[in-house]
Amino acid sequence: HFSLTRWFDTFEVSAASYVYNAGSFGAFAASLMMLGVDEMEITTEFQPNGTGAYFDAQDLAVGLSYGRELTDRFRVGLTARYIQQHIWNESAGGLAFDVGTQYQLPFRNLVIAMSMSNFGADMRYNGSDMSVKWDGDANFPNRLVPTRLETEAFALPLNFAFGIAMDLFRAPYARGLVALDAVHPNDNKECIH
């Protein structure tokens, strides 16, 4: 599967995936997602109309997944993903993991599912713009000291989800399904759909 979408003439979203069904061994998958932003002119407090220099930004996620039916009613899946964010000369990267389970009951094909997404270490931006020359006291002429700036680490948007679904009715050419899920993100409000 491959898709490419352009949003608002500035953002480009690309996604590609491949799944291999290994029969009783489960299913293996590879995925690639990318968000790119067109170059934009850099502005500053003193040059609000632009400096003449430009920057771009890009997010990338490359994942490997495995899923398997452990019994005729219980399924599990796991994804390991490398994530990288790039803004101008700085970038941050790290590993994230997703895990999910699904259990199906015989009553109206009731399915109970749970997942945890983006479990991983904090990320931190680093790059060439972090190296600066520092003057300890602007009132006295000093030799500029090479200095390295450091950004704060930030957490990945960890997400827990729980859901249930079941058949309302089944007919030869139609099926009614009702579903409910609850989502608990670490960086936003909980919600129920």
Placement of each model-derived feature along the sequence:
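Outer-membrane beta-barrel porins/channels
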Residues: H1, T5, T10-H193
